[in-house]
Amino acid sequence: MKLLGHKIELWAGLLLPDVSISGMSELRFPEEKPLLRGQDTEMESADTFLSAADTDWKEHDIETPYGMLHVVIRGTPKGNRPAILTYHDVGLNHKLCFNTFFNYEDMQEITKHFVVCHVDAPGQQVGASQFPQGYQYPTMEQLAAMLPSVMQHFGFQSIIGIGVGAGAYVLAKFALIFPELVEGMVLVNIDPNGKGWIDWAASKLSGLTSSLPETVLSHLFSQEELMNNTELVQNYRQQISSCVNQSNLQLFWNMYNSRRDLEMSRPGTVPNAKTLRAPVMLVVGDNAPAEDCVVECNSKLDPTNTTFLKMADSGGLPQVTQPGKLTEAFKYFLQGMGYIASLKDRRQSASAGAVPSASMTRLARSRTASLTSASSVDGARPRPCTQSESSDGIGQINHTMEVSC
């Protein structure tokens, strides 16, 4: 596995320390701990708790240059296949953010082909101890720089990242720093922009007039969802208050609201433009508070390897409210990269002539014109072939494929 062993200079003169295989091999890693039902009593009544069948999930606490990271993993590295690595939004943890999505039956059919690694931001996991007074929470850049330690610990050669909100920002930053370690990114509700003084002042004012859970809810859900006070909103209000340490959450929230611009530019728009190299699928609900931010992020990415998925009738948490549609989109995204070229959809098993929905067919075509065979998964995987590179005469793409479903 190739990891960067040299110093990496980030914005504003920030210098990250050496990150090397030899250095990381000297770190101490506690033994893995099975994730057993009943350990998190406050979560047992929630729909977001891991199902009883998921006894093969295991917890790890991993030492990194910027502190300990709590991760939950299922499976082992499979040949040359990347790991699926997730990063949750602020106010959540891997359970609250991803359980509905990863427990969805069709998603489980996909993930059995990969090792899955959920990363919890420092101090955000269920049952986390409160950080001592004066603790300096890692910056967003440092959160990204912690991930190579996770990859080294488990022997991951590369990852396909799935990030939501703040987690999408962290994974995008990771992909900019370590592009050779990333094969693909699914970025939900990403905001590529930093926070200015006006935003900072507004955030401070909001903190004075609203409780922390309410402030976080306004980040996660649209005003319409909050006004309707749906059962989903009520459930997350209770879970954010009871399952996430409020002091630790405040530190993460403050750091996210101090982030800098990702400083990406679409190739050809400025000299030496820097953007994400790997295939990217941007996802946002058409009623999400982050909709405009995701549209702006789309304008900064390479249109030849970017898919923009806007989910109709979806609010701020599409992975929770519409896991089926997102699973189908993710399946075709993987197929476009040359993975799981043949995967049976349980909903189509009753009819041999069933075909994917029109929107998902368009999504598949936008990612690739020819899929590799399933046997190529463990061998050398060819570079994804977009329509603009294919020889089927479909035509050349000069803009990002946008799909609504």
UniProtKB/Swiss-Prot annotation:
Decide whether keyword Cytoplasm is in the record. yes
Q: Name one GO cellular component term.
A: cytosol
Q: Where is the protein found, in the record's own terms?
A: Cytoplasm, Cytosol
Q: Which UniProt keywords apply?
A: Cytoplasm
Ranges of biased composition (kind: Polar residues): 385-405
Region: Disordered; residue ranges are 352-405
Matching InterPro entries: AB_hydrolase_fold, NDRG
Instruction: Indicate, by first and last residue, each region the UniProt record lists as having compositional bias (Low complexity).
Output: 361-376
**Pfam families from the UniProt entry:** Ndr
Q: Which family does it belong to?
A: Belongs to the NDRG family.
What is the recorded function of this protein according to its Swiss-Prot or TrEMBL entry? Contributes to the maintenance of intracerebral BDNF levels within the normal range. May enhance growth factor-induced ERK1 and ERK2 phosphorylation. May attenuate growth factor-promoted ELK1 phosphorylation in a microtubule-dependent manner.
Q: What is this protein called?
A: Protein NDRG4
The primary gene name is ndrg4
